[in-house]
């Protein structure tokens, strides 16, 4: 059994007990989150595709971590002009363990 959800501008294929690293969601570690944009659902026998979303399927999970990813460096330069700019960035993310996928 799996579903395709949309959150944070991206789409994820999720299964029960899977841990996902999503774009930052509000909430503390241990809070329950539910996803309302379910694009596709499969129970192993049949596949339901939303137009664009399914209304009778719910996916919920529990926040297991709120953290920031590793730092990436952005370095800009212009040749022969001594122009150099170095900038770092760390993206915030939320790790969510999928607990239930229910159709009904």
Curated annotation (Swiss-Prot):
Gene Ontology annotations for the cellular component aspect, listed alphabetically: cytoplasm; ribonucleoprotein complex; ribosome
One Pfam match: Ribosomal_L21p
Biological process terms in GO annotation: translation
Entry keywords, A to Z: Ribonucleoprotein, Ribosomal protein, RNA-binding, rRNA-binding
RNA-binding listed as a keyword: yes
Keyword Ribonucleoprotein: yes
Highest rank taxon of the organism: Bacteria
GO molecular function: rRNA binding; structural constituent of ribosome
Subunit structure comment from the entry: Part of the 50S ribosomal subunit. Contacts protein L20.
Family that this chain belongs to: Belongs to the bacterial ribosomal protein bL21 family.
Function: This protein binds to 23S rRNA in the presence of protein L20.
Protein name per Swiss-Prot or TrEMBL: Large ribosomal subunit protein bL21
Organism the protein comes from: Desulfosudis oleivorans (strain DSM 6200 / JCM 39069 / Hxd3)
């Amino acid at each position: 059994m799996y579903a395709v959800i949309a959150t944070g501008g991206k789409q994820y294929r999720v299964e029960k007990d899977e841990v996902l690293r999503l774009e930052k969601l509000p909430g503390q570690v241990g809070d329950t989150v539910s996803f309302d944009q379910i694009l596709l659902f499969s129970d192993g026998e049949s596949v339901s595709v939303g137009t664009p979303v399914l209304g009778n399927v719910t996916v919920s999970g529990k926040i297991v971590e709120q953290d920031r990813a590793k730092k990436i460096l952005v370095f800009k330069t212009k040749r022969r002009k001594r122009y150099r700019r170095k900038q770092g960035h760390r993206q915030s993310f939320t790790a969510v363990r999928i607990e239930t996928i229910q159709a009904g």
